[in-house]
Amino acid sequence: MKRTLIVFALSGFATFAFAQGPAKDPVASSLRQLEQRSQGNTIGAVEAMPADKFSYKPTADQMTFAHLVVHIIGFNNSICSKAADVPAPKVEESKEADSKDKLVAAVKASYDFCSEALGKMDDSKLGDSIDLFGGHQAPRAMAALIAASGWSDHYAAAAQYLRLNGITPPSAQQKH
């Protein structure tokens, strides 16, 4: 009886597993998940940095925190446009001297654009050749990979700036 129950349970699980089928647009779907995580962490980091620390830079040769934020804004608007094959938004260019409130709003808008653009993305165009940067041709898939790695790199940098100022980054804060 016990053996019959186990065989029945396993066969039911196998039927369920095979009924799932392959995921639709696994690359685009995965990129959307990564973007959502990046959005929460990066916006949280930008909001956590005090306004008077936006001019902070760890060494003379490194960029300020505000410069990092400006870079993130431009990166998001450009790379999500390329990855999803949608036009980049027409926005006022952010500047390092902009206020914290203005930079927070712009980084939020850049992630909103990414969410919207990636919502329209599917895997069918990943092999298309695109002008990635500076006339360099690459498959659209490269833009998706650069987006994912860039988001990780940018958040890691923002987290370091926070820690150097005694602030715990969002991803390291205990969730209750």
Residue spans for each PLM region:
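Positively charged n-region of N-terminal signal peptides that target proteins for export
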Residues: 1-4
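Bacterial N-terminal signal peptides
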Residues: 7-16
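Short, contiguous alpha-helical
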Residues: 32-43, 51-92, 131-176
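Acidic/histidine-rich alpha-helical segments that form the ligand environment
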Residues: 96-131, 138-154
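Cleaved targeting-peptide boundary
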Residues: 19-27
